[in-house]
Amino acid sequence: MTKISKIIDELNNQQADAAWITTPLNVYYFTGYRSEPHERLFALLIKKDGKQVLFCPKMEVEEVKASSFTGEIVGYLDTENPFSLYPQTINKLLIESEHLTVARQKQLISGFNVNSFGDVDLTIKQLRNIKSEDEISKIRKAAELADKCIEIGVSYLKEGVTEREVVNHIEQTIKQYGVNEMSFDTMVLFGDHAASPHGTPGDRRLKSNEYVLFDLGVIYEHYCSDMTRTIKFGEPNKEAQEIYNIVLEAETSAIQAIKPGIPLKDIDHIARNIISEKGYGEYFPHRLGHGLGLQEHEYQDVSSTNSNLLEAGMVITIEPGIYVPGVAGVRIEDDILVTNEGYEVLTHYEK
């Protein structure tokens, strides 16, 4: 079943006439055309009969025509009202309720004479949750490039270097491999600074005998990677090394349990129980992982409350961590493809 037919099924289920998609990544997912419209309207209308209409600034029309999109294009000037160029009456319209602003909703009511709204967010999330072979190949390449980033960062470590300097070196050097954009702000934290799970790299200087936490990812042809390694620089103290070994055991055990049909919460419990049994449960404050694809964090989450089942074609992260203020912060994260038989680890830098 195609992506569009899934949307049509949802239109029928909710007795709606059309779906209105405005999130740039979701529009790309359905059309193959990516745009960052800023304040301008950029939207895909999918009608119950399968017709697709893309609204975009007129200056982008030729780019859309050169893409894989085969539907109708409504290009508008900044001085024009896009809705006046495609007059419609849509009784019930499905929208991305998590993203559409109140102002845009008012425009839809006026422009398309909408009487009621439904939600198409979950349907799109479920579609994006299962990756195609093409998507998997892009994520695999993004993961390979993330491995290279870690390699670049580790090779640059030296006593006295700052966190910020290591970040800059990674992001500048990886451009030589064709990377134009990181998945998110690269994180490099030294020693006990890594006890802040989302710390900001700064001017802290690297000392001998401490851990260095790298959390980073790259975007390859719109698809993200996201990995974390905690690397020895010298010989950290005994407690820090004990924490590292516990996190590694938790991650390894959780990954080995991955296969279709297993509830996501069970994977979280495996890692969390290991950490708790070793006395560090209170220092593991976040979920075990999340979905990965066009965004570095997407549906579904690997958490203690998610009863949904793992399915072949999902790509998730597994990232247990222990963060003890004044001592150390350790997180290890890999990107995992759920296969028919079990799993494939996509990130490979040594642990």
Curated annotation (Swiss-Prot):
It holds the Pfam family Creatinase_N. The keyword Nucleotide-binding does not apply. It comes from the Bacteria. Mn(2+) 1 binds at residues 226, 290, 319, 333. Mn(2+) 2 binds at residues 215, 226, 333. GO terms for molecular function: hydrolase activity; metal ion binding. PROSITE patterns: PROLINE_PEPTIDASE. Its cofactor is Mn(2+). Its EC number is 3.4.-.-. Keywords: Hydrolase, Manganese, Metal-binding. Belongs to the peptidase M24B family. This is Uncharacterized peptidase SAB1567.
